[in-house]
Amino acid sequence: MKKICYVLLSLVCVFLFSGCSAGEEASGKKEDVTLRIAWWGGQPRHDYTTKVIELYEKKNPHVHIEAEFANWDDYWKKLAPMSAAGQLPDVIQMDTAYLAQYGKKNQLEDLTPYTKDGTIDVSSIDENMLSGGKIDNKLYGFTLGVNVLSVIANEDLLKKAGVSINQENWTWEDYEKLAYDLQEKAGVYGSNGMHPPDIFFPYYLRTKGERFYKEDGTGLAYQDDQLFVDYFERQLRLVKAKTSPTPDESAQIKGMEDDFIVKGKSAITWNYSNQYLGFARLTDSPLSLYLPPEQMQEKALTLKPSMLFSIPKSSEHKKEAAKFINFFVNNEEANQLIKGERGVPVSDKVADAIKPKLNEEETNIVEYVETASKNISKADPPEPVGSAEVIKLLKDTSDQILYQKVSPEKAAKTFRKKANEILERNN
């Protein structure tokens, strides 16, 4: 009997100790994780993103984050070889221009499961805010913020020239006249030249009720080459009149610090609304946000994902990467640091929480997006595979026109032929 009791007691002890051991293991500290996070931007973005990372590490001591950042051009040059080697960072800042290129090549993780299991909380985010990161119903990029195309103007130079902008109903002809008046009366460029063309030519098409790419990405959508001719003839007139910079001058701009409006050489810069804050911080002159020409009738403006976060399939820490994205998007303390610089927050809860604490320039962005949002249309799908080649082709074509090496008429036909060949080959 004693022997049986001893055996039973031994078994009980084994279970008790094993239970304690399992409990200790379960309650022990989490496994240390190192995440690589990459983004592009200027120095102000680098500074506050670093602070957000430090805040995340403080709240999650088991996570160490290695930051990798560069300007726009260098960022994509670095990302390409990393992608080829299967060594992409765990979280990569993504642009819609490259989303299809990486997503359709099976290099990005579908984030839908992380939104469904609550790892990324979408309870205060409108579904339309996320659509810009979807391809074939897979969420390859999570939108960090939204912005709207805008005209950013130096109020001192407008006043000096004795001109104003009637944003509700000004036309392309009004814009051209304004540029001439600014050059003549204020002695500065009337515009930064609407550079780069892959952003502003598609907007021009939208004001005419047309689109740049077909829905399926297999070719150009607009059929009338006269639209191309009209757009670039205006650009050429402005350069000839010295009211817009030459391509050589535009090529010297490597960051916001170099922009003509910051240097006081231009009264107007065309850009996305989230860029306003950076410009406002870099110049002493008062800047204002205006709706671009002819946006009203065709509802030419759209809410565009300013940028997205993606997780590559090669990441070994996808769950932790998704947790960081959730923090970046939904944490109010983090967004007090971000302050909408990456676009107006997609979370209504976060947007409402930070708005009372925004300064004048930051408030201007939110109010501009709210104004523009009253008259917008559905955003275009993410740029198709091959769009990077098309973008380069359009830029090269634009340069040739502005250098007067080719006529807009001839360039329109050549561009159409080559662009369609690229898109047909890739889609």
Swiss-Prot record:
PANTHER family: ABC TRANSPORTER SUBSTRATE-BINDING PROTEIN YESO-RELATED (PTHR43649:SF11), ARABINOSE-BINDING PROTEIN-RELATED (PTHR43649). It comes from Bacillus subtilis (strain 168). Transmembrane segments: none annotated. Induction: Up-regulated by growth on type I rhamnogalacturonan. Gene3D superfamilies: Periplasmic binding protein-like II. Belongs to the bacterial solute-binding protein 1 family. May play a role in the degradation of type I rhamnogalacturonan derived from plant cell walls. It comes from the Bacteria. This is Putative ABC transporter substrate-binding protein YesO.
